[in-house]
A protein has these predicted regions:
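Structured secondary-structure scaffolds
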Residues: 1-241, 257-294, 309-318
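Structured, non-catalytic alpha/beta "coupling" segments that mediate domain-domain communication
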Residues: 1-3, 220-235, 315-332, 483-510
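Helix N-terminus capping/helix-initiation residues
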Residues: 23, 90, 114, 217, ...
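Secondary-structure boundary/capping signal
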Residues: 49, 199, 326, 337-338, ...
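A short acidic (Asp/Glu
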Residues: 73, 328-329, 396-400
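A broad structural signal for alpha-helix termini and local helix breaks/kinks
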Residues: 156-157, 195, 322, 333-334, ...
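C-terminal low-complexity, glycine/proline- and small-hydrophobic-enriched intrinsically disordered tails
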Residues: 218, 222, 337-511
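Acidic, turn-prone loop/beta-hairpin segments
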Residues: 244-265, 278-282, 289-368
């Protein structure tokens, strides 16, 4: 096989340019292999294999014909059930099925197969080809995977060339290479019998992204097993119910779910499976934990419909990762069809309430700040007072800085220069300490939250916190929490804390 042929190499390079390689940095390795490849034997004289058609003393080299085995897989079931026999597999048959050469009457006459059978095989091939995604280890980049592309471009027309190659690392056991001599190999059947297929699969997926070696360990398996059992138990108690009027925490959790769907979908499409799985198992759990805390603080018992809707989306996305437990949970949720047949949840930007996400983040960060102050001061609180910004100029400066930072600038000098250049914020030069703190505040936020703030209107922080802190604040800290605007006339501010309030960063007094 003359892999050194420059025209053949160039065709392969064109294929690599057009196909998706994950991770993308491995593309250069493929092209380097194509550059140095040269002649390679297509046959050998020892071992098992298929006899070379024109010389029975030789056996076809496995890395020559086997690299297009997926073409054979499209028709293997017809071989296995006896529909196709060796004597039927003539050159004319393969020319018609794989290469679209000749016509069906010639294939029928030479193969002795009925037109119906040949149509059935061709339909199967056309359904599965081209190869959507080929997954393998990095050690095969220098041989099998490169030959896979070279042989496909040599044999098949362009529309049947491979579309994607995904390269992954190896699987380690507790940080060490698996080997019989080290005694650190767990037979697959034993592992599945002891723990089930789903925990084993998820433990491997969750241990590494593409190209990284997956460090398999039993502690991870036990943890995931417990997580799946917990999800099963949780969903067993949920019933589909009509969702009534939404409260603040409802709008937040439904909006967060839309965001999670978008994140997980993107991760799966880009083969960042570890990231997608982490979001399904843990990010959702974190969101639901906060939601449960909010609901319990208000004494609500009318959220089964919302929890059912959210966990239905979660389990549908879990299904490709852990199909067995997903089907069990899906049934517990009341569905009669299989989870694997359900539609992948669709992201809808219209269903994201940006204000609810921002306001809930404000509530969470305020609670966290109170907790941190109590930890540091060791105070047993008798009174908690929150001061929110109500200075219009400070708000205007904040919005201006926000826009500058979302635009990619975060240098203090650049920010100050742009503030001074704007007639509406030019007086900001008198408050450098405030500007520095706002920049620090925004640095700590995700790009998603900052973008939401830019796109949405301001909301009344005082009104929101006054309403929502009443329940969760009392439950968390055992005292009533007062909320003032920093410029309120009737403000209680014995220590002058109010002047430190910034948008989305209230000042706090604890007595």
């Amino acid at each position: 096989l003359n892999y050194g042929d420059e025209e053949w190499k160039e065709t392969a390079r064109n294929c690599f340019d057009e196909m998706n390689i994950l991770p993308s940095k491995i593309t250069t390795e493929f092209k380097e292999v194509i550059d140095w490849l040269h002649e390679r034997a297509c046959a050998r004289q020892q071992g098992l294999g298929t006899k070379l058609p024109w010389d029975k003393d030789w056996i076809v080299e496995s890395l020559s014909d086997s690299v297009i085995y997926m073409a054979y897989y499209t028709m293997s079931r017809f071989v296995n059930d006896g529909t196709l026999k060796p004597e039927n597999l003539t050159k004319e048959f393969f020319d018609y099925i794989l290469l679209d050469k000749g016509d069906i009457s010639l294939a029928v006459s030479k193969s002795k197969l009925s037109e119906n059978v040949i149509d059935m095989v061709k339909k199967e091939f056309k359904y599965f080809y081209p190869v959507d995604s080929r997954h393998s280890g990095r050690d095969l980049v220098q041989n099998h995977l490169s030959f896979f592309v070279l042989n496909h471009v040599a044999i098949f027309e362009k529309k049947l060339w491979p579309q994607e190659i995904v390269v992954n690392g190896s699987v380690m056991m507790d940080g060490a290479k698996m080997s019989k001599s080290m005694g650190n190999i767990i037979p697959l059947r034993t592992a599945i019998k002891d723990h089930g297929a789903d925990p084993i699969r998820l433990a491997i997926i969750s241990s590494a992204e593409l190209l990284q070696d997956a460090d398999f360990n039993m502690e991870s398996v036990y943890g995931i097993q417990n997580k799946l059992e917990s999800l099963l138990e949780e969903c067993s108690n949920l019933k589909a119910a009509q969702i009534g009027d939404l409260e603040a925490e409802d709008r937040w959790i439904l909006s967060k779910t839309q965001g999670r769907i978008a994140q997980i979908t993107e991760a799966v499409e880009k083969m960042r499976l570890r990231e997608g799985l982490q979001d399904i198992l843990f990010s959702f759990e974190s969101d639901l934990s906060w939601y449960t805390k909010r609901v319990e603080a208000k004494g609500r018992d009318n959220v089964s419909g919302i929890l059912h809707q959210i966990n239905s989306a979660r389990v549908a996305m879990l299904s490709p990762f852990a199909p067995h437990i997903a089907e069990e949970i899906w049934e517990k949720l009341g569905y009669t069809e299989l989870a694997s047949k359900s539609a992948w949840p669709e992201f809808s930007k219209e269903n994201i309430d940006s204000t609810s996400i921002q306001s809930e983040e404000l509530l969470k960060s305020t609670i966290d700040d109170i907790v941190n102050i109590l930890k540091i001061t060791k105070i047993n609180p008798q009174k908690i007072v929150i001061y929110v910004n109500s200075d219009e100029f400070k708000s205007k400066v904040y919005r201006k800085i926000l826009g500058i930072m979302v635009g990619g600038q975060n240098n203090m000098g650049v920010v100050m220069k742009e503030l001074i250049a704007d007639p509406q914020t030019t007086d900001a030069k008198k408050m450098p300490d405030y500007i520095q703190k706002v920049i620090k505040d925004l640095h700590s936020e995700s790009e998603e939250i900052k973008s939401m703030k830019v796109e949405s209107e301001e909301f009344d922080e005082k009104q929101f916190l006054s309403t929502e802190l009443a329940s969760i604040g009392k439950k968390e800290f055992g005292v009533e929490i007062q909320v003032f605007g920093a410029t309120d006339e009737d403000i209680y501010d014995p220590k002058g804390k109010a002047r430190h309030a910034r948008p989305f960063k209230p000042a706090i007094l604890i007595e």
